[in-house]
Amino acid sequence: MMSSPNNSLVKISIHSLLERREWDRAQELLIADPSVSMTIGSTYESLPLLTAVMNNPPLTLVQSLIAANPDSVTTKNEYGMLPLRTAIRSQASTEVIDALIRAAPIVVKSFGVSGKTVLHLACLYPSMDYDLFHELLELWPDATKWKDRDGWHPLHLACLCHCPSTIASTVLNAYPEAAAIADTDEEQFPLHIAALHGANGTLLQRLYHCYPDAIKARTKTHGWLPLHLACNKDATPGAVRVLLQYYPEAAKVGGKQCGSLPLHIASRNGCDAEILKMLFEAYPQALEKKNSVGDTPFECGAGHVSVKE
């Protein structure tokens, strides 16, 4: 018969091994004494399952920890952290996150201290697997209607982190009304956020149709329109074309503080020559306009070949 290891040593070691990612040794301790799955670590006052998912553990170890202590899936530490939420934040493997969901689907409806749902967290990480994201959405579709304490819905975060993917479109399909909701800090609509973070023309077009007024809305501090925000270093002609199509007058609008027109911004950021051409054609007089520091668009982009040409 296998003798149990020293219990005090086990209680100290299980969390240390998990933090050091010594998975095989942690598994051995768990097999020798499953009660270690109920011990509290000193670093985060957490159970071993929570400690493990912070460190990208293998699926087999997570399954063993859940089997030894099923309640650990729904147990928060003193900071309010739950294994599923922590696994998503730590970008654990798809298999590990899926195992946590299946062990306790109710956790999908949990909230963090900032008011974020699990779906909010899933929208924060570009590496999130689409099928897994869709599983979270199916378990709680109404999560798309919740906003965190900053006034951000999952759609805002999806536009921030997932513009090149289908996730932002999926969230928009689930709750298109969120396109008409601005955040509480900068009064940005999802259209502003998507424009700034490299959304393609198709997504911008869909956001516009869900709430056309967003294209004329200016952010609180700098007074940027979506077109200003789209004229960044990652701008694509398709995105700028869509924004100009629906609100060509935006090419004539300067920022509240710097007075820069979209052409100033695009020139400064070295945007594609096709983008510069579209902005010029929308407002030819922009070439002569100076911003608050006295620079014309040409002077803003003096270091970029595309502007010189």
What does each model-found stretch correspond to?
Residues 280, 287-309:
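Leucine-rich solenoid repeat scaffolds
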Residues 40-43, 76-77, 111-113, 147-148, ...:
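Ankyrin repeat boundary/linker residues
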Residues 28-36, 63-73, 98-107, 134-144, ...:
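Ankyrin repeat domain, specifically the short helix-to-loop turn at the C-terminus of the second helix
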Residues 69-126:
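A generic tandem-repeat structural signature
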Residues 3-57, 61:
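N-terminal segments that cap or nucleate solenoid repeat domains
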Residues 110, 121, 126, 130-132, ...:
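Core solenoid repeat modules with strong leucine/isoleucine-rich periodicity
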Residues 16-21, 51-58, 86-93, 121-129, ...:
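Ankyrin repeat A-helix N-terminal signature
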Residues 10, 44-46, 80, 115, ...:
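Start-of-repeat signature of ankyrin repeats
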